[in-house]
Swiss-Prot record:
Keyword GTP-binding: no
InterPro entries per record: GAF-like_dom_sf (IPR029016), HrcA (IPR002571), HrcA_C (IPR021153), WH-like_DNA-bd_sf (IPR036388), WH_DNA-bd_sf (IPR036390), WHTH_HrcA_DNA-bd (IPR005104), WHTH_transcript_rep_HrcA_IDD (IPR023120)
A Pfam cross-reference name: HrcA_DNA-bdg
Name the UniProt record assigns to this protein: Heat-inducible transcription repressor HrcA
Species per Swiss-Prot/TrEMBL record: Thermobifida fusca (strain YX)
Similarity field: Belongs to the HrcA family.
A GO BP entry: negative regulation of DNA-templated transcription
Keywords of the record: Repressor, Stress response, Transcription, Transcription regulation
């Protein structure tokens, strides 16, 4: 099948780019006279008008019923994103602000909370972020803290910044030497292991311990197993819904809000966003959920080094500043990875 994008000459592409940029900026249908005045296209309004007719016939722009101007269609935005725009890098001040804001986070929950707030602020869209899956997290450190003769606190820290604390009661009297011995055995066996694989190492740990210390170790391992349950698996957090009111949504606003409230919809949405290591854009009807077909989604994977842990992104109107939004999503994803790697 012939791709009609190949029949568009440079001038028509320039006209389409100008229409998208003006419509995103003004939220008003764009006419040929305005294009001639605002952009150095090098041709008359009449020539621009002819190009707009061709673009409309090919489905890249459309005419609202109440206006003589034209607006981009989903197809027009897709061509703009694929061929006519470049990702806009953030300014030094913006990058510095991101780094400062995120570096103050103390644990994974706060990283997620701060990231969503930051991304919503930077893009003026709705920000969404998926928690890292435990299947992609490993043990970074285990700590045992005596709280009394028969109480211990277990602290589990993962490479993705997750911190779990559990208090273990009702133990036989625990000496400092026993705690130190068990702490060392657990860390030797578990550090660097995937959380889902950690319980398989428990028999090895028990075998290293004297018989009289094993009941305490078994109690600790039982609580540790509970800590490994997928507390956040598949959870998606979103923020910035107040931005929707300023986006020009009207009849579709309730549908968008209802879709955002369904965690399973957001999980599926991010899962459909293609290669997790790449910046991905889904526009309008490309989104399978009916409630989100008036929106565009820009998403990127985040992680540690080459390992992608989950995705984050924004949801907004198809009338979106794509270069700026793509730049913000990409930058924030990179900074989140750096913060996680540094923990």
């Amino acid at each position: 099948m012939l791709d009609d994008r190949n029949v568009l000459d440079d001038r028509k592409l320039a006209v389409l780019r100008a229409i998208v940029e003006d419509y995103v900026s003004t939220n008003e249908p764009v006419g040929s006279k305005a294009l001639a005045e605002r952009h150095k296209l090098g041709v008359s309004p009449a020539t621009i008008r002819n190009d707009m007719v061709a673009l409309e016939e090919l489905g890249y722009i459309a005419q609202p019923h109440t206006s003589a101007g034209r607006v981009p269609t989903d197809k027009g935005y897709r061509l703009f994103v694929d061929r006519l725009s470049k990702v806009k890098p953030l300014s030094k001040a913006e990058r510095r602000a991101i780094e400062t804001f995120l570096s103050g986070a103390l644990d994974l929950d706060e990283i997620v909370s701060r990231t969503v707030r930051l991304l919503a602020h930077l893009t003026r869209q709705v920000a969404i972020m998926q928690y890292p899956s435990l299947t992609r997290s490993s043990v970074q450190h285990l700590e045992l803290v005596p709280l009394g003769p028969q109480r211990l606190m277990l602290v589990l820290i993962t490479n993705t910044g997750r911190v779990e604390q559990r208090v273990i009661d009702g133990l036989a009297e625990v000496s400092d030497d026993v705690v130190e011995n068990l702490r060392g055995a657990l860390n030797r066996a578990l550090v660097g292991k995937w959380l889902t694989e950690a319980p398989k190492e428990f028999p090895t740990v028990l075998a290293q311990l004297p018989l009289e210390e094993r009941p305490i170790a078994e109690s600790v391992m039982s609580v540790l197993t509970e800590s490994l349950v997928e507390k956040h698996e598949g959870k998606v957090v979103f923020g910035g819904t107040a931005n929707l009111a300023a986006m020009g949504f009207s009849a579709g606003l309730r549908d968008v809000l209802e879709a955002l409230e369904e965690n399973v919809v957001l999980i599926r949405l991010l899962g459909e966003m293609g290669d997790a290591s790449m910046l991905t854009v889904r526009i309008g009807a490309e989104n399978n959920h009916e409630g989100l077909q008036s929106t565009s989604i820009v998403a990127a994977g985040y992680g540690i080094g080459d390992q992608t842990l989950a995705k984050l992104g924004v949801v907004g109107p198809t009338r979106m500043d794509y270069p700026g939004t793509m730049g913000a999503v990409r930058a924030v994803a990179r900074y989140v990875g750096q913060i996680l790697a540094g923990q």
